[in-house]
Structures are given as structure tokens and as C-alpha cells.
Amino acid sequence: MLYTDQDDPVLIDRTGRRTLAVTDPRTHCIWLAKGLHGRSLERVLLHELGHATLVSYGMLPELHRMVRPAYWTEAEEWICNLLADYGAMIFWKASDQLGYDILEWQPPYARDGIA
């Protein structure tokens, strides 16, 4: 993860829009705008980690198989927004139902890290 100024061209995404963060699959780097903090930083980071996970674990071809090419970017953004907006709640509710913190356990693939 690298922080950069909000007006840095690196924060222009593949659609040509200026964003608060960008994941670059070629360099395996997440770029975040300086000044993000609190819940905004959490949401943006979770969203970008969603992109990194899709790329690192080779999930994009599967997504592309299920979605028409015109909607590939929109579908990827939807998945990353789902993770950012509801991911923590899902784990909290599962932990509550099971009676223990499920985040204490790490699946083997999570130990390898996200490229």
C-alpha cells in the first residue's frame, strides 16, 4: 500500500475517473489518497483489498465467465462494494451466532497474503 496526493494521476481509474484509491494489478500495489481516515479509510481499503483478492487469486476469469463483457467493470465494482459495505457485518453476525470470533482462524490461503 502506498499513499499519494489526491491530485496524483495514479488515482485516475481505468474508466478515466479520479478516485480515492486504485489497485494496480500490474504492480500489485494499492494506491490510497492521503487524508483518508476513520470509516472512510476502512471502506476504501476493504474495497481495494477486494480488487486485490480478485486479481491475486485468479477470480476475474470466473467473474468474466458469468457476466457479459459490457458489465465486467460494473460487476467487479459491485463485488468490492459488497465486501466494503457488508463484509464486517457478515463476519460479526457469524461470530455472534457461533459464539466465537471467526476471524481468529485463518484459512490456509489467507496466510499466503494478497499480492
Labelled PLM ranges:
Residues 1-39, 58-115:
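Metalloprotease/metallohydrolase-associated module, dominated by Zn2+-dependent proteases
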Residues 43-55:
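Active-site recognition of the HExxH zinc-binding catalytic motif
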